[in-house]
Amino acid sequence: MENKQQHRWVLYILLVIISIFMLFPVLWVISSSLKPSTELFAWPPSIFPNEITLNNYISAFQNANFGRYLFNTVFVTITATIITLIINTMAGYALAKYRFRGSTIILVFFLSTLMIPLEALMIPMFIVLKNLGLYNTLWGVIIPPAATPTGVFLVRQYIMSIPDEMIEAAKIDGASDWKIFVRLILPLAKPILATLTIFSLMWRWQDYIWPLIAISDSNLYTLELALANFVGEYSVDWGPLLAMAVLTMIPLITVFLLFQRFFIRGIMMSGMKD
């Protein structure tokens, strides 16, 4: 019993040490964003600011057009997440509960796209984007990555854990396929929908490569593009840049804290039935 207690304490100490190493860069960014510019490069460096100031955050909104970039990112993220949920949920439900010839082949085809490097898809996706007239628009950032094989697979695996008898009972009661999907499947699939929501929000909020290709107008930049372009050729205004980085992190952390219970449950349930 004592050995178990000792092992547990050792494990806790290791987890605390690892957590400190993981969180230190984040804490440093937050602390540095509250420092005046003269203190950022002072020697010896200090973890906590001697003088707290919000000038960096004010400058980010007034001089760096942060509000515009934030609006673009929120619009892209929320719209893309809604489209992703609709497409992936319907596709996952069809592959999980509908028996038709070629369903396994379609699933394998979806999953096989995960083995193709994203860079190999960029040129054909860009050509299609330009031919459709979506280049240099926010919709050009939203639509192409909407259907994700990872999302389809997760939803399909979770819905397979729902007993077929429930669907058959609903059909006996006269429910249509659409009513079964909306009134039965979606409420039962809340955990995996929350998981997919978190994944989609993270993917779209942090996406850099595809917006870089699909957008050239600086007024349409997302936060990731804005942060990258905030670095000048000869100098970097570190104060506002750090403030923008902190403001960029807050929404993702908030979403994860709100949905983490569903997130963990959804991931666990997705692998329960093959």
Please report, for each region that a protein language model flagged, where it lies by residue.
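A structural signal for multi-pass alpha-helical bundles of membrane permease subunits
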Residues: 2-274
